[in-house]
């Protein structure tokens, strides 16, 4: 035999029905049907079955009761629901709405609850507390950012000092090396071919111009051998 919930929802019921244990706390069969229809209209049939199947079997009756109170509270007070009525000490209104639903009655929003000054004060207080928490978190974040930036600045200063000390040490080492080994001028030594001296006591010695030409010829002898391979003409001595 199908349970009262599956009967009003027009769905098949079995021995493993997940809706049957949720309605055991309601005494009459008609009240079980009214509660099931009201919750299913508010949350949707698929949503109701999804909520019930997502919790263990022992917690399903309490879940269905919570859904029923929340649906009645949102219908009577759409702004704050059952939690708002509990906060403003109007829980008896929510209980009366549940009893009305179990009897098969209809609910409508109550304007007195929406314009309740105590509810507005409570909302303002909660908003103020939330703003204080947000500002506190922002201050904490700013402190963390400041400390982090200070640490980064200190690290950069240390790195700069380290680089400066390394550069100073490098300059000192290079400066010391240049001072400890002073440069000694080295005389220029021409090749041996240019250092050959032609004495003038040799018989048949040529004139000064001839000696200069012969020295230049001896100095360029190596270059002429390379140029000869390239097809250039040999320099002739016209004063011999």
UniProtKB/Swiss-Prot annotation:
Biased composition (Polar residues): 207-216
Region annotation Disordered: where it falls in the sequence: 200-233
Domain LOB: 1-107
Tissues in which the protein is found: Expressed in young shoots, roots, stems, leaves and flowers.
Family note: Belongs to the LOB domain-containing protein family.
PANTHER family found in the cross-reference section: LOB DOMAIN-CONTAINING PROTEIN 38 (PTHR31304), LOB DOMAIN-CONTAINING PROTEIN 39 (PTHR31304:SF1)
Annotated protein name in UniProt: LOB domain-containing protein 39
């Amino acid at each position: 035999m199908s349970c009262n919930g599956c009967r009003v929802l027009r769905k098949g019921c079995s021995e493993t029905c997940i809706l049957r244990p949720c309605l055991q706390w309601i005494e009459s069969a008609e009240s079980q049907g009214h509660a099931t229809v009201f919750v299913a209209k508010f949350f949707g049939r698929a949503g109701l079955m999804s909520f019930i199947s997502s919790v263990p079997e022992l917690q399903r009756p309490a879940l269905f009761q919570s859904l029923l109170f929340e649906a009645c509270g949102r219908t009577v007070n759409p702004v704050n629901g059952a939690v708002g009525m509990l906060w403003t000490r109007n829980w008896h209104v929510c209980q009366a709405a549940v009893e009305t639903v179990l009897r098969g009655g209809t609910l409508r929003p109550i304007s007195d609850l929406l314009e309740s000054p105590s509810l507005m004060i409570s909302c303002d207080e909660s908003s103020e507390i939330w703003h204080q928490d947000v500002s506190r978190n922002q201050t904490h974040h700013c402190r963390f950012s400041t400390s982090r930036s200070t640490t980064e600045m200190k690290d950069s200063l240390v790195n700069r000092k380290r680089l400066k000390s390394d550069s100073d040490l490098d300059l000192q080492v290079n400066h010391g090396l240049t001072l400890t080994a002073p440069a000694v001028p080295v005389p220029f030594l021409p090749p041996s071919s240019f250092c050959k001296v032609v004495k003038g006591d040799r018989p048949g010695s040529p004139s000064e111009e001839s000696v200069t030409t012969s020295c230049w010829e001896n100095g360029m002898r190596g270059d002429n051998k390379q140029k000869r391979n390239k097809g250039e003409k040999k320099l002739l001595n016209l004063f011999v």
